[in-house]
Amino acid sequence: MDIKSVFNRLLNHEELQREETKDLLIAITKGELSDAEICALLTAIQMRGITVDELLGFRDGILETGVPALLDCDRYIDVVGTGGDRKNTFNISTTSCFVIAGAGYKVAKHGNYAATSISGASNVIKNHGVTFTDDLDKLNRSINECGIVYLHAQLFAKAMKFVAAIRKALPFPTFFNLLGPIVNPSCPKCQMLGVSNLDQMRLYHQVYQKIGIDYAIVNSIDGYDEISLTGDFKVTTNNYERIFHPKDLGFDIARPEELKGGATEEEAAEIFDAVLNNTALPAQKNIVIANAAFGIQVMEKGRKSLEECIDSARESIDCGAALRTFKKFVELNS
């Protein structure tokens, strides 16, 4: 690869082809680019802004050089946020995944340790004694026996370790921050994604259209990368784009302090447990129900109304199904 030619094109604000960014990613994993060249690449693309095809090419490279998670069921969903909203909320997406699984839907949750908050998905899962694995037999047993499997990103996306130190040293986020939500190694056909701004919503909307999956992208207008119920929120799916108000769905408006994830991993885990045990604050429970409901709607492909999806999510908590699902998950994966 002629890296000098790539840099010249980037400096001239030219776009790279999907195959080219895939090759760039593979070259990084082979040690063909120096740290200085990787740093320059990340900086140049960040300054110009990444295109849909460029992002998809980097995604292709990560999936090709990573460990696949071949699950033996056809339809399952991942619920994830981009992170970086600096709101330090509790583990809303992760909790929602167990509510969705408790409602009878298959979930392949892809996650990692926290980058900007107190507790990420992997933190709260590990806090309960779960051992991460890339063993396909164990992964398939988990999704088939309790409806949910957890895919710890560091075991699968091998390419990320080649840029980890450089990303940490740079004083700004890079396009690698955008890749996390779209490199689930099981390649789910359904995804619900929370983004922290409308520019990201537009980008992922085009990305998902090209990937060809069923999706919902959500953004709270006040900057949360999930449905926060603190005010209006926007939802973009395969079929519609709409702004909702919490009261449109029968929910009270939440206060920002009710979403806080605590000061420690242990406090974050306590909130996670409280929601599944149906002892959480009403706002915490409602936020999880709202997020889970839109995930269920993606899985249903319009066969259920949003109100019915909300009822399914609420019942998953109220009848104890979400909690039983989590206990079975911990039992299988510890």
Question: What are the roles of these predicted feature ranges?
Answer:
Residues 23, 57-60, 98, 165, ...:
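Alpha-helical scaffolding segments of alpha/beta enzyme cores, especially the outer helices
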Residues 9, 64-69, 89, 104, ...:
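Glycine-rich anion-binding loops and their surrounding alpha/beta cores
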Residues 40, 95-99, 287, 291-294:
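Short amphipathic alpha-helical face segments that pack within enzyme cores
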Residues 1-89, 103, 107, 254-259, ...:
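Acidic, glycine/proline-rich low-complexity segments that act as flexible tails and inter-domain linkers
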Residues 45, 100, 208:
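Hydrophobic pocket-lining residues that define ligand/cofactor binding sites across diverse proteins
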